[in-house]
Each structure stands twice: as C-alpha cells, then as structure tokens.
Amino acid sequence: TENYTTIGSNVDKSAASEDFRFNTPWKFGISLGHTIGNQIALGAVYEYADYGSCDMRTIDDAYYDYYDGYHENSSSEFYMNQLTKKNLKGVSTIKLGGEFRPDKSFAIRLGYNHVTPMFNKGAVRDQTIDSPGVYYASTTDYTNWGATDRITAGVGFTFDKFRLDLAYQYSQRNGDFYPFMSYYSADYIDADNVRQTEVNECSPVSVSDKRHQVLCTLSYSF
C-alpha cells in the first residue's frame, strides 16, 4: 500500500509505503454423497469459517537468505484486528448438487449454495483507529453485504477422450452502502450555554449485486 500527502509540507510530495500480511481463518467442512443406481449422483457440503479471527499484520522486516529463500517478520495490528473481530463473524456455506446421467456421454447438473452474511449488524469502516491500514487508505466507502445465494445449471458431454462442460450460474446478494462512517462529537456547551452535540450521520443506501455467468470448460484426457 502506498500513498502521499502535501499537507504541512514545503515539498511537492512526500511519500511513504507499508507492507502488510493478511492471515485468513481456518475453514472446516463436511460433505456427504449418495448415488442412485448408475444414473443419479447427489451431494451436500457444509463449510464454516470465522472471519472475525482474521489477522492483519504489518511486515517489520523481510529479506532473502543466501539460498534465495524469502523470510519475513511481522506483527499483528491490534486495533485493526479488534475492529475486524467486532465487525465480522462466522460464515456458514451450504452447497447442494445433483447430476443425472441418462447416457455415459451426457450429463445434466443442478446446484445451489447459500452463504450467510460475513458482517455483523451495524458494522462500520472505522477511520479513527490507530492503524497503518487507516493511515494509508485512499477511500472511505464500504458496503455491508448480506447473504449470498447461487443457482447453477449445466450439461456435460463426453466424446472419446474429450470432455465439454457448459454451465450457467446466477448469484444474488443485497447490502447497505455507506460513502463514509457516521461521526458524533463529544458534547459541548455553546455560546448560549446550551449543551450541543455535532452529528455527521451517514444513512445507508440499499444496493443489490446480481450476476449472470456462463462457463465453458473443454478438457482432454491423455
């Protein structure tokens, strides 16, 4: 990440950079499968990952040794990780699928998956925390996405050693978009001796993300 500023400086530009490391959470899952005769296959998968346990780290030192091996030392960003723990939560993913094969050279497939929301209710992109991830940020907007649903349908063809797979996928999710976080100042007494609170509140805008995808895969078995 790199950014620059000319505020409070007599030069045209002063630059600084920061290297980060982001450790994603463990993902756990179970799966079940069942066949009916030699024409129908059914499958179900459940996965869970706790995104509140993500670890944002800053690179303190990095180097290559004599054998060209890369090494680095990093430290956790305490305040950013506290914000992550507050804003994000565990996500469950459910995947269901089935395949019908009336002939050895042809297959019909259907699938569905549901992903629960990653964001806690009221999650904010806090621009006031003491973290390089905030210092070097060049945007203030964020979107709290809700659950995601996907539906897929496809067909597969087998020609000798060639295999052709065609699939269509529709995905949909809704969210709340914020151009910036809301700010509330501490109470103060104005010139008329009246207690006041400055408020810069940002109301969210409902947004929707809908996607249509067509996928094609051609493979050859040696």
Predicted region positions:
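Outer-membrane beta-barrel porins/channels
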Residues: T1-F222
